[in-house]
Amino acid sequence: MHIIKTLISVGVAFSLSACLSLEGVEIAGLEGKSSGTLTKYRCENGYKASIKQRDNGVVSIAFNDGKDSYVSYLNHVPSASGTLYVNDKNTLKWHQKNNIAVFTYPDRNYAKTGQLVTTNCHKY
């Protein structure tokens, strides 16, 4: 009986450790296929990102940091140059011009530092 309780505890711990942890990002469920143009990018920090155009000036961004995957929705906002999308919390920004984008996202310690990090991403 003790072994079974230990195995259950270990299983719960592994399940919880697999949860997404990036602070300041809304984690959305992955939805089924929908219409829209999908564009893929590789970022200088090692991230891979996919941007999908949605309705009403909204894009979904899916990105992977090599460990965890995230999905969020960003709204189009006016920009002097290129196309800019921002989430409601202003913690994710995707500023795209031609085949290059600047991706701004929360630092891993965002809850403590409030710092955002930026990387350049290239369409492939």
From Swiss-Prot:
SUPFAM superfamilies: YdhA-like (SSF141488). A lipid is attached at residue 19 (S-diacylglycerol cysteine). A lipid is attached at residue 19 (N-palmitoyl cysteine). Residues 1-18 form the signal peptide. The keyword Signal applies. One of its GO terms (cellular component) is plasma membrane. This is Uncharacterized lipoprotein PM1176. It comes from Pasteurella multocida (strain Pm70).
